From Swiss-Prot:
It comes from the Viruses. Belongs to the closteroviridae capsid protein family. It holds the Pfam family Closter_coat. It is found in: Virion. Transmembrane segments: none annotated. InterPro entries: Closter_coat. Capsid protein self-assembles to form filamentous capsids, about 1400-2200 nm in length. One of its GO terms (cellular component) is helical viral capsid. It comes from Grapevine leafroll-associated virus 3 (isolate United States/NY1). This is Capsid protein. Keywords: Capsid protein, Helical capsid protein, Virion.
């Protein structure tokens, strides 16, 4: 009994005297004989008669290939005048794929063995959703609680009270310090780096920053001040929009930030799609880039690439 090619099917000749044929209905893999692809994909029924029939015993469906013997290495195909076709065929050891369609594998062992381009692990039966506890860019909740306790002690010491109204005012002063002096880990404070309360008390930036750093000591955070204050992002934005916080316009100008984007470009705020629109996100990114560029130029004037000359013009 002979096997005949059909339109709409995908075939591949496997080198075994060009008699063994692989059959599928998808577009993955490579064809060893370009004429098969041409005639079956783009040809007519009449053109199929130009391809010799193959004995049925040498035809293998895609599913059977997984258990078939290992195929010998293919010989380099002879050069042909016609343009090379796009790689289309079938994926061994997997279900047949159709163009632009994923195959979902329920067995994780099979998925890990295959790791195919068009294969996804089937998660339909999983009801648990991973919960992110500690977000990147922030200190952990546990460390934040330690810092909160330390700042409460500082509040009582500096403000002379720790009632709710006093705590609220104190944290407004803490945020104002961040807006005025920013939160770079390399900042060195001077004796006049402080802000005054309504009743004339002085709150020094170094007090606040050292309090946070000491509470987060030995936790491994690169910049605990910035990563702690990131929790105050919504408060920073709303307080700035409502005129409760005053920006350091000199630094904002150095970073190239227009006034309407001041609330979104304080260096300790963390972008969130709940509070940032696309323009605010762009402004935040551009401010970061400019700040990094300024820091790099200040730290090292060595010319590493001629394109750096363009940035200096």
């Amino acid at each position: 009994m002979a096997f005949e090619l059909k339109l709409g099917q995908i075939y591949e000749v496997v080198p075994e005297n060009n008699l063994r044929v692989r059959v599928g209905d998808a577009a993955q893999g490579k064809f060893s004989k370009a004429s098969f692809l041409k005639y079956v994909k783009d040809g007519t029924q009449a053109e199929l008669t130009g391809i010799a029939v193959v004995p049925e015993k040498y035809v293998f469906a895609t599913a059977a290939l997984a258990t078939a013997a290992q195929e010998p290495p293919r010989q380099p195909p002879a050069q042909v005048a016609e343009p090379q076709e796009t790689d289309i065929g079938v994926v061994p050891e997997s279900e047949t794929l159709t163009p632009n369609k994923l195959v979902f594998e329920k067995d994780p062992d099979k998925f890990l063995k295959t790791m195919g381009k068009g294969i996804a692990l089937d998660l339909a039966g999983v009801t648990h959703k991973p919960k992110v506890i500690n977000e990147p860019g922030k200190v952990s909740v546990e460390v934040a609680m330690k810092i909160n306790a330390a700042l409460m002690e500082l509040c009582k010491k500096v403000m002379g009270a720790d009632d709710a109204a006093t705590k609220t005012e104190f944290f407004l002063y803490v945020m104002q310090i961040a807006c005025t002096f920013f939160t770079s880990s390399s900042t060195e404070f001077k004796e006049f780096d402080y802000i005054e309360t309504d009743d004339g008390k002085k709150i020094y930036a170094v007090w606040v920053y050292d309090c946070i750093k000491q509470a987060a000591a030995s936790t491994g955070y690169e910049n605990p001040v910035r990563q702690y204050l990131a929790y105050f992002t919504p408060t920073f934005i709303t307080a700035t929009l409502n005129g409760k916080l005053v920006m350091n316009e000199k630094v904002m100008a150095q970073h190239g930030v227009p006034p309407k984007f001041f609330p979104y470009t304080i260096d300790c705020v963390r972008p969130t799609y709940d509070l940032f629109n696309n323009d605010a996100i762009l402004a935040w990114n551009l401010a970061r880039q400019q700040a990094f560029r300024n820091k790099t130029v200040t730290a090292d004037n060595t010319l590493h690439n001629v394109f750096q000359l363009l940035q200096k013009k």
